[in-house]
Amino acid sequence: IEQFRSPSLGELYTRRFSERLVDYHAEIFRSLIAAGVIYGGDTNALALMYVAPVITLIGVCDRQPERETECLEKLKSHVKQFYSMVHISVGNAR
């Protein structure tokens, strides 16, 4: 709640829980693209597509711990779907 009352806390929250995660994953995706493991593209967009559902599911678990099992299943499904979208199969480069 304080992040909405205090601009400095809101900025800190955004940096810590959004921007840093996106930047970190974008760098991982840049490395994977360079290595030919995943398809190329906008690494920041890939990072947002990957991280946003994770942040959402963590938020659900924080507010409703009894839904942890459900959220973990959704997370597994998300990771599998994301992987199938970006992974280059041997002999199947775009």
Regions picked out by a protein language model, each given a short descriptive name:
Residues S31-G40, G91-A93:
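Surface-exposed helix-capping loop/turn segments at secondary-structure junctions
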